Amino acid sequence: MAQFEWVHAAWLALAIVLEIVANVFLKFSDGFRCKIFGLLSLAAVLAAFSALSQAVKGIDLSVAYALWGGFGIAATLAAGWILFGQRLNRKGWIGLVLLLAGMIMVKLA
């Protein structure tokens, strides 16, 4: 594995942002009834995976994927709350805390 460089972290951050954008577009697509948002969602997912592929050139795949997925879920939850008024119940919050704890454990391992 190549030595870590900040450019790889930037690629990972871009992948996370693109995943969030894809999820928001997917919600706006209303089950692909609004085709433009559905297509934008697919394009954002492809771009997110492309950015992730660049990130793993300098970050271990297990770490990059865990961070990408974890931050993507947490930020999508925030976007759902802000944009759509969606709320988590107690079990959802427990799951989010466990997810964040798992991300920390992977990073520290």
From Swiss-Prot:
Report how it sits in the membrane.
Answer: Multi-pass membrane protein
> Which molecular-function annotation in GO is an example for this chain?
antiporter activity
Task: Tell whether DNA damage is among the UniProt keywords.
Answer: no
In terms of InterPro entries, this protein maps to: Small_drug/metabolite_transptr (IPR000390), Small_multidrug_res (IPR045324), Spermidine_export_MdtI (IPR023737)
**Location in or out of the cell:** Cell inner membrane
* Biological process according to GO: glycine betaine transport
Q: By its UniProt entry, which Pfam families does this protein fall under?
A: Multi_Drug_Res
Q: Where are the transmembrane segments?
A: 6-26, 36-56, 64-84, 88-108
What Gene Ontology cellular-component terms does the record carry? plasma membrane
UniProt keyword annotations, A-Z: Cell inner membrane, Cell membrane, Membrane, Transmembrane, Transmembrane helix, Transport
Q: Which HAMAP family match?
A: MdtI
* Complexes and interactors: Forms a complex with MdtJ.
Q: Which family does it belong to?
A: Belongs to the drug/metabolite transporter (DMT) superfamily. Small multidrug resistance (SMR) (TC 2.A.7.1) family. MdtI subfamily.
State what this protein does: Catalyzes the excretion of spermidine.
**Which protein is depicted?**
Spermidine export protein MdtI
**The species this protein was found in:** Escherichia coli O81 (strain ED1a)
Task: Tell me the lineage of the source organism.
Answer: Bacteria, Pseudomonadati, Pseudomonadota, Gammaproteobacteria, Enterobacterales
